[in-house]
Amino acid sequence: TTSQFVFAMGLNNLVTDGAVANSDYRYWGSHFYEWGMTYNTRIAKNNNLLHFKYGFSVMYNNLRPTENRWFVDNGTTTDLEVNPLHMGESRLRNVNLVLPMHLEFDFSGKTIKDDKTYYNTHKSFRLGIGGFAGLNFKTKQVIEYDIDGYESRNVTKGSFNANDFIYGLSTY
């Protein structure tokens, strides 16, 4: 079993009416960060192909609306609405603790030295298929605006009707 520190980042967006085009969210401003730890265990004693990869990560997912909008919790729904103030920043952030699990195919070869076989890892192409499950443990909205030269920043914490349990499929 080997361990590995994980740091990942990328872009977030939502599919609306079957497309990402004309999104309600900024393409480059909506992104995610992830950091965590994974463990990789070879499944077969005498073969290096199959590994079980598992661990934990903390994920920060940000959505930044377009056109001076912000998220408004209307009871059972959270809607995007135009804010009467001119905002310099509007962002909804979900922070999740996730447990990823993957079946990894590692095509690294083996080395034989002094009649002992050593299985190399991470020396060749790898492919992982699996999924993740986790908990949302914080949702907050950050808005920044300026009124008559006074810069303000408001942070509102709440559920914003986000799911407490998250899950999904993933590949790498």
Range-by-range predicted roles:
Residues 2, 42-50, 108-124:
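Short loop/turn motifs that connect adjacent beta-strands in outer-membrane beta-barrel proteins
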Residues 3, 27-33, 93-99, 123, ...:
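Residues that define the transmembrane beta-barrel architecture of outer-membrane proteins
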Residues 3-4, 9-14, 22-81:
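Glycine- and aromatic-enriched membrane insertion/assembly motifs of diderm outer-membrane
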Residues 5-9, 52-56, 101, 127-131, ...:
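Membrane-embedded beta-strand positions of outer-membrane beta-barrel proteins
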Residues 9-15, 58-64, 105-109, 131-139:
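Transmembrane beta-strands of outer-membrane beta-barrel pores
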Residues 18-28, 64-94, 137-148, 152-166:
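Extracellular/periplasm-exposed beta-strand and loop segments of Gram-negative cell-envelope proteins
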Residues 38-40, 90-92, 102-106, 170-172:
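Transmembrane beta-barrel domains of outer membrane proteins
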Residues 111-142, 156:
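A mid-sequence, solvent-exposed acidic-amphipathic segment
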